[in-house]
Amino acid sequence: MRTRPGRRARRSRGLVLNILTNTEKLVGDIIRDSFTIAGEVEEFYSLAWDRAASVNKAIRSTPRFTRIFGELIRIVATYRLHNIKARFLPPDEAERSLENLHRKNAERVYDLCVEMRGGLIKIGQFASTYMNVLPPVYVEYLSRLQDRVPPMPYETIVQRIESEFGRPVEQVFARIDREPLAAASLAQVHEAELFDGTRVVVKVQMPAIERTVETDLTAFTIAADFMNDLFPPLGLSEVSRALADSVRRELDYTREMDNIVQFRKQIASEPRVAAPSVYAEVSTRRVLTMERMDGQRLVPFLENASAERRNRMLALIAESFCSQIVTHGFFHADPHPGNIMVLSGDRLGLIDFGCVERFSPETYALYAQMIAAILTRDLDGMVRLFAGMGFVSHEGADETLREMAADFIDLLMLSPDQNLADADLTQKITRGMELIRKYPSVRVPRHFVLLGRVFLTLGGIMMRYNPDINIFMLMAGQMNGGKR
């Protein structure tokens, strides 16, 4: 039976009206949602700049603060916008959108650090060690940061030295080279000579760098507070303040001088390891004068040395850091290849003690108990030790710490015959990196972060050159001979 034309027309009109009604509703929803999103983003920007208005006027009025804070807040705003849009997306699509946003913003942060340098370079370098907090793509980008800048004019360095000592540079040093050995965002290094003929290197802090760093840290911590509101389990506010403390510590050269003095006392009975002497009479909070150590950088040595010499040096590096950590509880916490030298007689030379870590007796005891807990697979004990060390789950869930403890026990258990050449250990180190990222809601104490930084950095060097070093026996030997 055929449908009459009139009935078909009525049905068509009804269908069209239904489509138009639904379309009108959809458009209305889109407009309403768009206004909601626009309103929330506008409110966010208003809050951000109101917060910035409370900052010291000398800082907030600088073009540098405006540039850095403006870019960081725009980045934070993209995450706020994503969180709003994600309400209307399927979960898998929202996840892909977030991953793409992470990559885009990681590149923006990297570009900002490279452009502005100053304290941002140091913040970025330190931040790259927080692998349990930052998305992997941020760690990837920030790990690339290289702190190299065009040198400051010689005359500027001379003025800095003279202002620190209150007398002409000719009365401080017998000679100081015009060309620097190195130039970075925070300091410049020149070779010089004392009046007794001793060759030294002089690390001179850049003029006005303290104000620059405070500007950078202020912008960074405010932006981190707003990010913390978006991702509270990550504890970004706490991380930003820890990073700020680390950067500020590097600006006080009396701290670094004390670190070197303590380290030299620590290695006094170890002729194979050296650190530069320091000259307090020609050092201040902003100028550090040290012994000029002649040697070869680590990577060129490893690339050109025989297998026997290469493995002997790598074994010495491993032994030295195990001794620093296990025997003394005071260690160099930034062992990248640029801070490691090979001296005459294939001795190990360490430089740049701006970043070190000291274990308190209580912390040291907890680490010793942790090793025992791992060896005996004592999960309950491991959870208690994590809590005692300062591991805190931002979600307030003890089960999270328990899962993390179980993973660490599984990860760190080694058989006595295992060495770095084993493929299995390569997998363990890879798993270790993944494990750190697995628990972003857990606040990890600074000493553990720095310890992880040491092992990851040295582990990368060892794995690249594949030495036959038995870590288990080495650590056990250090524990048995420990002095603490």
Predicted regions and their residues:
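N-terminal accessory/targeting segments that precede structured cores
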Residues: 1-188, 214-236, 469-470, 474-477, ...
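ATP-dependent phospho-/nucleotidyl transfer catalytic cores
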Residues: 136, 143-150, 162, 210-215, ...
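Glycine-rich ATP phosphate-binding loop
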Residues: 191, 198-206
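Conserved beta3 strand of the Hanks-type protein kinase catalytic N-lobe
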Residues: 192-193, 335
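Short acidic/polar mixed-charge low-complexity motifs
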Residues: 196-198, 347
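Hydrophobic residue at the +6 position relative to the catalytic HRD Asp in the kinase catalytic loop
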Residues: 338-342
